């Protein structure tokens, strides 16, 4: 999973996350108000990314004009990743939620903290979750 993030392979990330969600979680795990459901997926993804011990992984980092969900600095001093998560109420809303996440990354300039650290090879991820499914999009900033 971590290799797929580093490679910018949104399709592989989506496949791995969907398998993990299907095998590990219960729909009851996200039993909360819609505006709080994202928190469960945020914590789950932080735990999964932590398996890469040499990465600096930070949550809710102030960058640009806001706070990005997850900011990751891999071993490569030029590389960085921004991950913005969204919860979609229905499966049909997954694509739109991903685009909303990506637009938020661009509009709020979440890449600023990484660029200030001298990182220029930055990947942005918009990930939307709905129950045991997800959609992942990636672009190079």
Language model: regions and residue ranges:
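Domain-level recognition of nuclease-like catalytic cores that cleave nucleotide substrates
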Residues: 113, 117-141
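Extended alpha-helical interface modules used as scaffolds for assembling large macromolecular complexes
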Residues: 1-109, 134-141
